[in-house]
């Protein structure tokens, strides 16, 4: 009688199943053209979806739908596949002065502390989801490049008319990590209203004003 040994065969079968499971795992971010994870899961720096700090913490390289040390979700909603052009505000060249660039929100926010005005990059907002006019001023958005997964947080300081966002050129270039936006003249982005964190008590910063 021939005695069969199933050990090596069983081991190979288990290994094959394990590799197949990994290959079929959902990917996201720049590894998959800026795709977002389903069920609001976080996208890790390596392009995998999950909900633990390794996936969700910005300090761990989280690419999108991040939590942890990032801003908490704010009121205003979110939108996907929105057109984002760029505008040359260059706030760093004008002391982050809203009046100097004739921003719509300067009426209400021009006298805010320098630390507030310079905390985030600037954008004009006219997106399909969220408040408009004065109600949008000063609010923050987490903006994600759908092609690469690169993201940043911006503050609304102005209005626009393109049906999406008009990012400061510096912000635009920051998330245009593959240069396609520069070639096309626009990006396709997702945005989410987030908490700006302006209520954090930072007395040393709050009194600094370069005006």
From Swiss-Prot:
Disulfide-bond pairs as recorded: 28-43, 37-49, 42-56, 62-66
Q: What induces it?
A: By wounding.
Query: Could you tell me the keywords of this UniProt record?
Result: Chitin-binding, Disulfide bond, Signal
Q: Which Pfam families match?
A: Barwin (PF00967), Chitin_bind_1 (PF00187)
* Signal peptide interval: 1-25
* Gene Ontology biological process terms from the UniProt entry: defense response to bacterium; defense response to fungus
Q: Which residues form the Chitin-binding type-1 domain?
A: 26-68
User: Mind telling me which InterPro entries this protein's record contains?
Assistant: Barwin_CS, Barwin_dom, Chitin-bd_1, Chitin-binding_1_CS, Endochitinase-like_sf, PR4, RlpA-like_sf
List the molecular function annotations (GO) for this entry. Answer: chitin binding; RNA nuclease activity
Describe the location of the Barwin domain by residue ranges: 77-198
Full protein name: Wound-induced protein WIN2
